[in-house]
UniProtKB/Swiss-Prot annotation:
EC numbers for this chain: 3.1.1.29
Xref: InterPro entries: Pept_tRNA_hydro, Pept_tRNA_hydro_CS, Pept_tRNA_hydro_sf
Signal peptide: none
Protein name, as recorded: Peptidyl-tRNA hydrolase
UniProt site (Discriminates between blocked and unblocked aminoacyl-tRNA): 9
GO biological process entries: protein quality control for misfolded or incompletely synthesized proteins; rescue of stalled ribosome
Subunit structure: Monomer.
A Gene Ontology cellular-component term: cytoplasm
Catalytic activity field: an N-acyl-L-alpha-aminoacyl-tRNA + H2O = an N-acyl-L-amino acid + a tRNA + H(+)
Entry function: Hydrolyzes ribosome-free peptidyl-tRNAs (with 1 or more amino acids incorporated), which drop off the ribosome during protein synthesis, or as a result of ribosome stalling.
Length: 190
């Protein structure tokens, strides 16, 4: 069973913020397929659905971002999901808006939600889709920036990015060939 995790912070005030882009992609896939996060356990909202005949576990941690691993690891453990079947979607300050990077494995790169997942799983050997949100300008702090909502102009780009990342997930579920998905979906979304 594949496991798709979108990272974000819970609560209305965090909706459509840069830090919640992982939630937005998972929500896009769920809505497109008429699925919903119908279970809550282990500090997470999740569902198990069938896509292309395969079971897929979708998770949105109901912790704050920095504790995401406290939701992801127990749910994966409960359903016997191996880290190699995990893909985590999250915001990345080091990529410009409109950039998407798929990777087989790697460090947290300073992202506290990823640090928590790596710590709780005891490995960084899992797939991830990094979604560029750019860096703050005009002296804004990083926390203020990532917790800020996208402007209307930015949302035009980010809606394309959300759809693009959603298609990458669907392609991976369909083919199980993350190397091919990386070749097709890495880069700037036009």
């Amino acid at each position: 069973m594949k496991c798709i995790v979108g990272l974000g912070n819970i609560g209305k005030r965090f909706e459509l913020t840069r830090h919640n882009i992982g939630f937005e992609v998972v929500d896009y896939i769920l809505e497109k397929n008429n699925f919903s996060l119908d279970k809550q356990k282990f500090k997470g909202a999740y569902t198990i659905e069938r896509m292309n005949g395969d079971k897929v576990l979708f998770i949105e941690p109901m912790t704050m971002m920095n504790l995401s691993g406290e939701a992801v690891a127990p749910i994966m453990d409960y359903y016997n999901v191996n880290p190699e079947d995990l893909i985590v979607l999250y915001d990345d300050l080091d990529l410009e808006q409109g950039q998407v990077r798929l990777r087989q494995k790697g460090s947290a790169g300073g992202h506290n939600g990823m640090k928590s997942i790596i710590k709780m799983l005891g490995t960084d050997q899992f797939k991830r889709i990094r979604i560029g949100v750019g860096r703050p300008t005009n002296g804004m702090t990083v926390p203020d920036y990532v917790l800020q909502r996208f402007s209307n102009d930015e949302m035009v780009t980010m809606e394309k990015v959300i759809e693009h990342a959603g298609r990458a997930i669907e392609k991976f579920v369909e083919t199980s060939r993350f190397d091919h998905v990386m070749n097709e979906f890495n880069g700037e979304v036009k």
